[in-house]
Structures are given as C-alpha cells and as structure tokens.
From Swiss-Prot:
Pfam families documented for this protein: Methyltransf_3 (PF01596)
Source species of the chain: Vitis vinifera (Grape)
BP-aspect Gene Ontology terms: lignin biosynthetic process; methylation
Pathway connected to this protein: Aromatic compound metabolism; phenylpropanoid biosynthesis
Family as reported in the entry's similarity comment: Belongs to the class I-like SAM-binding methyltransferase superfamily. Cation-dependent O-methyltransferase family. CCoAMT subfamily.
Residues binding substrate: 16, 158, 189
Protein name: Caffeoyl-CoA O-methyltransferase
Catalyzed reactions per annotation: (E)-caffeoyl-CoA + S-adenosyl-L-methionine = (E)-feruloyl-CoA + S-adenosyl-L-homocysteine + H(+)
C-alpha cells in the first residue's frame, strides 16, 4: 500500500508530468529534484499539497528548472503573473541576488498569504512586491509610464490562459532585449494534440483553444526566439530579439 507521501507524489505525477512513464518521472524527482530541493521549497510544496486547488501549483522539477535558469541569466529584476501559494515565486526569490526584485501579481491574495510565512522564514520576502488584482491594468499603466520599457530580465506567466496573448502583447515591451518571458502550461495536459472528440475535463477543453492560439502566435512572432520544453505541464521560453 502506498504511503501518504508516495500518494501525494504520484498525484503530482498525474497532474504535472507529460512523460508516458510515471516511474520515469518519479525517478527524476527522487534522483535529482527532491534531494536538492531547498528546505523552504519543500515546506511550501507540502503545505500547498493540502490545499484544495493544489493542481494549480508549479511542479517541483519546474521549480528547480526556473531557479537554475534565473541564475544562468543573472536575473535581477523579474515579474510573475499568477502566484497561487508562491512555490515558483519562492524558487525565483531564492535565485535572485539580495537586492533582486519580483513584481508579483495575482487576483487572490489569500492564497499568497498561505505561503507567505514560508517565504518570510526563507529570508526572501523583501524581494517581493505583491499586488492583488488583475495584471492587465497594471501592465497598461507600466507601459504608459514609459520608464518600465525593457526593464525586466525575466517574466513568468502562470495565470488565466485566455489572457496569455493579451499579456504577451504588453510583456514584449517590458522585457529587455535578451530577456526571457516564460509561459507555463503551453502543452496543457497534453490536450494540444488531442482529437476534437477526446474526453477532456471541462476546464481543459475550455482553455485548450487559447493555448493553441498562443503557441501558434509565439511560433510566428519575429521579435522573439522560442523554446518549448516538456517540463511540468509544458513551458515556452521566449527570448526577446528586438
């Protein structure tokens, strides 16, 4: 019989891995992710697993990937749209220098406050500027101000899929040339290759066309170069060229 810990991990496998083999994904987690996961991220991951909406969280392997990516590009000024309890936010904050900054936006502050004590205990809360509410009005104001153009090293989007294209139209001006925008869930439970009559969950079917539209638009955007990776539920990295 599986232990509660094993059951929780396999639940993560079912929701967040696109690998055909659960055993292979479990091997990745057990071999290279969990043993190197910072204690604060482990604590927040386990706390989030008890939340009824835990399917919304970033997977542990994707958190590890984001943390390393931010270190590789020496990111200092970042943005995150869609925070939930803050697992990916914590991965980002831990990767930034002490004077690094994250503009974090989410419509639900209550979820963020669930993970905030862990973030505070990790000593990185001072890097985060959290704003509650829709992100689009904030982005529009930043663009209108003018001083934020090309100011962000990295932007991570894990929010309302039906607005991803609207985000992209604005974020391309806010990320610096050579900077990266990461869009999460771009393989959307694998539904991007599902036949029209496939039995999909209602929310998966609803957002599927928005994800497909985004993927098509990103592939055709000459202002960026892209790389779509099967990490977590799929993440597309967009490096701004001009």
């Amino acid at each position: 019989m599986a232990t509660n810990q094993e059951a929780g991990r396999h639940q993560e496998v079912g929701h967040k891995s696109l690998l055909q083999s659960d055993a292979l994904y479990q091997y990745i987690l057990e071999t290279s992710v969990y043993p190197r996961e910072p204690e604060s991220m482990k604590e927040l991951r386990e706390l989030t697993a008890q939340h009824p909406w835990n399917i919304m969280t970033t997977s542990a392997d994707e958190g590890q990937f984001l943390n390393m990516l931010l270190k590789l590009i020496n990111a200092k000024n970042t943005m995150e749209i869609g925070v939930y309890t803050g697992y990916s936010l914590l991965a980002t904050a831990l990767a930034l220098p002490d004077d690094g900054k994250i503009l974090a936006m989410d419509i639900n502050k209550e979820n963020y406050e669930l993970g905030l004590p862990v973030i505070q205990k990790a000593g990185v809360a001072h890097k985060i500027d959290f704003k509650e509410g829709p992100a689009l009005p904030v982005l529009d104001q930043m663009i209108e101000d003018g001083k934020y153009h090309g100011s962000f090293d990295f932007i991570f989007v894990d929010a309302d899929k039906d607005n991803y294209l609207n985000y992209h139209k604005r974020l391309i001006d806010l990320v610096k040339v050579g900077g990266i925008i990461g869009y999460d869930n771009t393989l959307w439970n694998g539904s991007v290759v599902a036949p029209p009559d496939a039995p999909l969950r209602k929310y998966v079917r609803y957002y599927r066309d928005f994800v497909l539209e985004l993927n098509k638009a990103l592939a055709a955007d000459p202002r960026i170069e892209i790389c779509m990776l099967p990490v977590g539920d799929g993440i597309t990295l967009c490096r701004r060229l001009s």
